[in-house]
Amino acid sequence: MIKNNCAVGIVAALLLWSQAVFSIPNSQVDLDISAESIARIALYYEDRPLNGKEFDFPLPINGISQKFENTSSFFHLIGNVDNAEIVFLENQFVLPQVFGGDTHINLDGSFIHQGVETDSTKKLRLPVLKNISQATTSNGVKVKFISEFLAGNYTKGKYANTFTLIVMPIL
């Protein structure tokens, strides 16, 4: 009987002790940590970031071709991915007359990368630089627009439109 009482006492003490252990708050915490970096690309022109959404690109008359024509300086892509594609959203480049007429100027648009001229309505793959200090003529791109006809064929007036350049990171 004494052995049974002793065993019951030990079991009761163990149960009370185990209950006390379970009532102590756990001092271990699991932290689930995660981070996500999204692709970022900035468009630079003449070694400066293009802030804002508009960029003026006048088309003067070229003294040799006698067409409305302009070729930009170099654009560069700066960001945290290796490559990106650029393309203009529009399939046609048309400058309507702003005031007093129905005349318009059709333009051909092109990209010039590493001396090769390509259609600007087709995607062009370009390197994305980590810093503007890496910019060279071989990793930049120029944009060129030229009118379909000689400037003298168009009615006198102002012609204007906005075209959208899309920059898409390649992940």
Where are these regions (language model features)?
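Short, surface-exposed beta-strand/strand-loop-strand elements in extracellular ectodomains
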Residues: 105-113
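Bacterial N-terminal signal peptides that target proteins for export
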Residues: 1-8
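Extended, solvent-exposed segments with strong compositional bias
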Residues: 112-136
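N-terminal signal peptide c-region/cleavage motif recognized by signal peptidases
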Residues: 18-20
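Hydrophobic helical h-region of N-terminal Sec-dependent signal peptides
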Residues: 10-16
